[in-house]
UniProtKB/Swiss-Prot annotation:
This is Dual-specificity RNA pseudouridine synthase RluA. Disulfide bonds: none annotated. Keywords: Isomerase, rRNA processing, tRNA processing. The active site is at D64. Its EC number is 5.4.99.28, 5.4.99.29. Dual specificity enzyme that catalyzes the synthesis of pseudouridine from uracil-746 in 23S ribosomal RNA and from uracil-32 in the anticodon stem and loop of transfer RNAs. GO terms for biological process: enzyme-directed rRNA pseudouridine synthesis; tRNA processing. Belongs to the pseudouridine synthase RluA family.
Length: 250
């Protein structure tokens, strides 16, 4: 399923929310690729924009083009290796917000559905109990909404345990409440409700690659301004980077 037209937002060109000698964090807008695509017309990306000012900048994780929010980059190879290892061992934690179609009945829960690439329709993913990779997403209802036109939506706080491609989007669809504006997994009114995918990476916790102390970063959510810095209310990681020899490899 090819991208029909790529018109990424340009104002602001970059929005840096934190920077030191080792890491740089930005608020990536919806509609901008995390890294360049294969075609020349898809070169514009969060990474390529940062590289104009930071030639040594390194990618350590990605967000879907349509997802907005927090991305952390490494400013040198040593920081890149340290951060990538944390993602590999699932030492990072993330909090997302999503507006989904309809009112979700349960106040909280865990979605445990294995995912696999829907190869004929790639990059779409699908639930596959036989061949899919284990995928878990905890969720909490933040707010149930009724709009002026009668439409019902729910603001969801999503806490991914695993990090599969399109995981949050497919899990919400499987729950019966697709994320509004989702060009792959929402249909009809759920798709047309919003001009963008209303999925935002708000918080990330990790261990600083130099000091090895736990820290977190937060980016406010445009479509849910009540989002607050609360990641350590949901996760309780060690305050200092653990010994990798004591950890199971993801």
């Amino acid at each position: 399923m090819a991208m029909l037209e790529y018109l990424p937002p340009t104002d602001p060109w970059t929005e840096i929310i934190f920077e030191d000698d080792h890491i740089l964090a930005v608020n990536k807008p919806s509609g901008l690729l995390s890294v360049p695509g294969r075609l020349p017309e898809h070169h514009d990306s969060m990474w390529s924009r940062l590289q104009e000012q930071y030639p040594e900048i390194q990618v350590v994780h990605r967000l879907d083009m349509s997802t907005s929010g927090l991305m952390v980059f490494a400013k040198n190879k040593r920081a890149e290796a340290a951060l990538k290892k944390q993602f590999q061992y699932r030492l990072t934690h993330k909090v997302y917000y999503a507006r989904v179609w309809g009112h979700v009945e349960a106040d909280s829960g865990m979605i445990d559905l294995p995912l696999i690439c829907d190869w004929p329709n790639r990059p779409m993913q699908k639930v596959c109990h036989e061949h899919g990779k284990p995928s878990q997403t905890a969720f909490q209802v933040a707010k149930r909404e009724v709009h002026a036109n009668g439409a019902q939506t729910t603001i969801m706080r999503l806490l991914p345990v695993t990090g599969r491609s399109h995981q949050l989007r497919v899990h919400m669809q499987a729950l019966g409440h697709p994320i509004v504006g989702d060009e792959f997994y929402a249909q009809g009114d759920a798709f047309t409700f919003s001009e963008r995918l209303e999925l935002h990476a708000a918080e990330l916790s990790f261990y600083h690659p130099k000091s090895h102390w736990l820290r977190s970063l937060f980016v406010p959510c445009d479509f849910y301004p009540d989002a607050e810095e609360m990641i350590f209310s949901y996760f309780d990681p060690a305050r200092k980077l653990p010994d990798y020899k004591s950890l199971p490899k993801s």
